[in-house]
A protein has these predicted regions:
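Cysteine-based protein phosphatase catalytic domain of the PTP/DSP
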Residues: 1-91, 103, 109-117
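P-loop (Walker A) phosphate-binding loop of NTP-binding proteins
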Residues: 94
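Glycine-rich nucleophile elbow surrounding the catalytic serine of serine-hydrolase chemistry
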Residues: 97-103
């Protein structure tokens, strides 16, 4: 798990499991975005039943044809609301390298007014 910008972390699924609760608390994580495919729902799912952590679970196919852009407004709103409450957000997928990283990058581009050029 790495802090990409202040308060926004990116990591693999393993960083959001029950045995990581102390680490999540030490980093001040209050919100988690769980990114998975429908077929991963059996094993990529919220693991922490702690009322201090708010989850957003997104079913996003890990394919070249998935329209991930349609999820950006929901992700942005969730992260913005967490920040307004002085929270910190972990975004994770299975490995934390494609779908979840894309969502984090899109948030940063929107927040700082960056283009793809």
């Amino acid at each position: 798990m790495q802090e990409i910008i202040p308060g926004l972390f990116l990591g693999p699924y393993s960083s959001a499991q029950k045995h990581c609760l102390k680490t999540l608390r030490d980093h001040g994580i209050s919100h988690i975005i769980c990114v998975r495919q429908d077929i991963e729902a059996q094993y990529i799912k919220p693991q922490i039943n702690d009322l201090s952590i708010t989850y957003l679970t997104l079913n996003i196919a890990d394919t070249a044809t998935e329209n991930i852009i349609r999820f950006f407004p929901t992700v942005k709103q969730f992260i913005d609301e967490a920040f307004q409450r002085n929270g910190k957000v972990l975004v994770h997928g299975n490995n934390g390298i494609s779908r979840s990283a894309t969502l984090v990058l899109a948030y940063i581009m929107e927040k700082y007014g960056l283009s793809s050029k």
